[in-house]
Regions:
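Non-catalytic terminal/accessory segments
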Residues: 1-239
């Protein structure tokens, strides 16, 4: 058997040792590049240049370093079509430059995990769900903080609060308990009664304005929930 196990701790170290000569070669040629272990992007000004550089660098890797280039994963593409280390790229017309952001696949993966952590049938307390959500949020933001994602954080915040409202509404269980808790949160008795006895599905009830008022951002923050937007704004590298 040849090579090292994929995903092992040793693989990135060995890749850096082997590809150090590649870094020197690309620097000597004056190329703009980013490399993490064996994952590399080379940036040039035109498609013609990109095809030429890809041929030459692939030849250098195979002939000088004795490594095999995986051509199924190697391609020439515009920045908008790239996914690199979980990031995607877009052109900011106001700044007139390309910027990084979480790739759509990374966002979808986050949403899937967030949905799992806010599943109403998961038999743990809501405080436990918030704790797990906070771990997810902090880890995700700390990784992607170099990207531009204020609007995305705002959208995800709204989605998280909505799903937590559904968890809380289910926890209240009976109409009497729901009326009592809504009134504690400042909802008048008539509105609380109508909301509690609406008979609608939880997903619909928790979209209503009364629920947005009763279980708002401030109250969920007091409950311990970390705001993605606030956490990102405090740590944003490009803001």
């Amino acid at each position: 058997m040849w090579g090292t196990p994929q995903g092992g701790n040793l693989s990135p170290l060995l890749a850096n040792i082997m590809l150090n000569e590649l870094d020197k070669e690309m620097e000597k040629r004056g190329l703009n590049f980013v490399r993490y272990a064996d994952d590399c992007i080379i940036m040039v000004g035109s498609e013609m240049s990109a095809n030429r550089v890809m041929r030459n660098i692939s030849r250098f890797i195979e002939e000088k370093l004795g490594l095999k280039v995986n051509m199924t994963k190697s391609k020439v593409d515009k920045p908008q079509g790239l996914k690199y280390l979980g990031f995607g790229f877009y052109f900011d017309s106001r700044a007139y430059q390309f910027k990084a952001k979480p790739h759509a696949k990374s966002v979808a993966k986050f949403k899937k995990r967030m949905k799992e952590l806010t599943c109403r049938s998961w038999g743990v307390s809501n405080s436990c769900k918030v704790e797990k959500l906070n771990q997810l949020i902090r880890g995700w933001i700390n990784y992607f903080k170099i990207g531009s994602m204020k609007r995305l954080c705002k959208e995800l915040d709204s989605r998280i609060r909505y799903r937590l409202r559904m968890c809380i509404w289910k926890q209240w269980k009976t109409p009497q308990n729901r009326i009592k808790n809504l009134m504690k949160l400042g909802v008048d008795k008539d509105t609380a009664w109508i909301t509690a006895y609406t008979g609608s599905r939880i997903a619909y009830v928790c979209q209503r304005r009364v629920m947005n008022f009763a279980i708002n951002k401030e109250r969920l923050t007091k409950f311990g929930l970390v705001s993605m937007l606030d956490y990102y704004t405090e740590r944003c590298v490009t803001c």
